[in-house]
Amino acid sequence: ERIQAVLALLGRGRLLRRGVFLADGNALALSEPLLPLLELVRAHFPGEPVMGFLDLFTGLKKAPSWWERLGGMGLRRVYIGLETGHAPLLALLRKPGHPKEVLPLVRALKAAGLSVGVILMVGAGGKAFAEAHFRESLALLAELPLGRGDVVYLSPFREDPGTPYAALGLAPLEDLEGELQRWAQAVRRL
């Protein structure tokens, strides 16, 4: 029923869509409950590529065979919210683990034949972290086995008032658009 409702909502606009994005914040972390969902997607959207989001630290708990299985069910791309390659900034953002932990995850995804979308938050940490965030994120990207079909997303970070992050009082970047351009140029050179 839910899929029929979505199809009705999209109407002819569905023809503009290329693939199915599992829009839960961490859909690929579901493990076994994900399998019937992928079967439904395959039945209602035959041949359409499936994409989903995964946080880095949940993905580390999955065996390479899991990713191969999902690839066989239509999964084509996994988006990873890496956020930064700078460990102190990752800790400040209250994310567990170390940025380098993305290396074995991306290797496993690539070995399973999946493409990867790496998401970095440009501007996170403000002025205090800008250079280390830039330098270490690019160095980590250079270590990843990315290739054709993979994507690096540079997401502009904007502070929301009243959040724990805002309470830190970090001075934001003065020119976020300029910083995004700097990152984009550097990523293209990798």
Give names to the regions the model predicted:
Residues 77, 100-163, 180-189:
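Conserved C-terminal portion of the radical SAM core fold
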Residues 10-14, 41-45, 67-75, 107-111, ...:
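Acidic (Asp/Glu)-rich catalytic clusters
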Residues 3, 34, 63, 102, ...:
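Aromatic/hydrophobic pocket-lining residues that form the small-molecule binding cavity
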Residues 36-39:
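N-terminal active-site wall of soluble small-molecule enzyme domains
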Residues 1-31, 42-62, 75-102, 115-117, ...:
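Core AdoMet radical
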Residues 34, 64, 130, 163-167:
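Short aromatic-enriched loop/helix-cap "lid" or pocket-rim segments at secondary-structure transitions
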Residues 87-92, 127, 161-166:
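A short acidic, helix-capping loop that chelates divalent metal ions and anchors anionic groups
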